[in-house]
Amino acid sequence: MQASQPETWHGTTILTVRKGGKVVIGGDGQVSIGQTVIKSNAKKVRKLGKGDVIGGFAGATADAFTLFERLESKLEQYPGQLTRAAVELAKDWRTDRYLRRLEAMMLVADKDVSLVLTGTGDVLEPESGVMAIGSGGNYALAAARALIDSDKDAETIVRSALDIAADICVYTNRNLTIEALAAS
């Protein structure tokens, strides 16, 4: 008899679009374990710091909240410097024994920059102002890139692209949380 492996938590889709003086991050609300939807209205996108940074996460929820707290601490150390705060968090994430075990990715943005942060220490800025993470991330990214040159605004692109991702990815739903900031 074989010991069964614990079911793994799946899914989410987080997307950011920077266009027309706005930056928007949106995410779906589905949390699944194995083939079962555990929750359909999770809030994976929120404002950080003093409300001048927005972020979304994919991965283990408790891990992501730990990382959000650490990022907020770095933002207090380096106010108005999202890139510096993100790099400092990434250094800690790679070198701290506890943080290294955290399984999450984050998209964060302020008025000037959008970044993706990974547990391998990557801090990446998208070339086109569009970036996505999570199980439906590639679908949302492709849809957003297809729409970026249209007359649609950033929030409409995020909503449309996440709807398309929800049509394709079984770990993504249409219960969206959207946050936006004025961008430079």
Curated annotation (Swiss-Prot):
Binding residues annotated for Na(+), in chain numbering: 166, 169, 172
EC number(s) on file: 3.4.25.2
Gene Ontology MF terms in the entry: metal ion binding; threonine-type endopeptidase activity
Source superkingdom: Bacteria
UniProt entry tagged with the keyword Metal-binding: yes
Catalytic activity: ATP-dependent cleavage of peptide bonds with broad specificity
Xref: InterPro entries: ATP-dep_Prtase_HsIV_su, Ntn_hydrolases_N, Proteasome_sua/b, Proteasome_suB-type
Active site: 12
Location(s) in or outside the cell: Cytoplasm
Subunit structure as annotated in this protein's UniProt entry: A double ring-shaped homohexamer of HslV is capped on each side by a ring-shaped HslU homohexamer. The assembly of the HslU/HslV complex is dependent on binding of ATP.
Name of the protein: ATP-dependent protease subunit HslV
